[in-house]
Amino acid sequence: MAHKKAGGSSRNGRDSAGRRLGVKKFGGESVIPGNIIIRQRGTKWHPGRNVGIGKDHTIFAKSEGVVEFRNGKNGRSFVSVVVPAEMPAKAAD
C-alpha cells in the first residue's frame, strides 16, 4: 500500500522586530531634559551626573548640557551630562 503523510506545517518562519537599542546621543552632543541618551538591556552603561535611569535601564538627561562618556572603577562605563558654565551676556553694541 502506498501511503503519503499528511502535509504538516513548518515550525520555522517567525521572528521579532529589532528593539532599536543603543546610543541615541553621542559624546559631545547637546541634550535637553528628557532626551534619551542610551537604550539598553541591563546596565552596560551606568548613570553619572545629571542623568537618570528608567526601569528598563534607559539613560536620559535630567538637565541641559553636553553628553560625556567616561570609564570608572571596576571596568564600569558612565554617562554624564556636563552643564556648561554660565556664559556672561554679550554687551549690546
Swiss-Prot record:
UniProt entry keywords in alphabetical sequence: Ribonucleoprotein, Ribosomal protein
MF GO annotations: structural constituent of ribosome
Entry's Gene Ontology BP terms: translation
Disulfide bonds, paired cysteine numbers: none
PROSITE patterns found in the cross-reference section: RIBOSOMAL_L27
Start and end residues of each stretch annotated as Disordered: 1-22
InterPro entries linked to this entry: Ribosomal_bL27, Ribosomal_bL27_CS
PANTHER family reported in the protein's UniProt record: LARGE RIBOSOMAL SUBUNIT PROTEIN BL27M, RIBOSOMAL PROTEIN L27
Family classification: Belongs to the bacterial ribosomal protein bL27 family.
Record NCBIfam families: L27
Name listed for the protein in its UniProt record: Large ribosomal subunit protein bL27
Naturally occurring in which organism (per UniProt): Parvibaculum lavamentivorans (strain DS-1 / DSM 13023 / NCIMB 13966)
Designated gene of the protein: rpmA
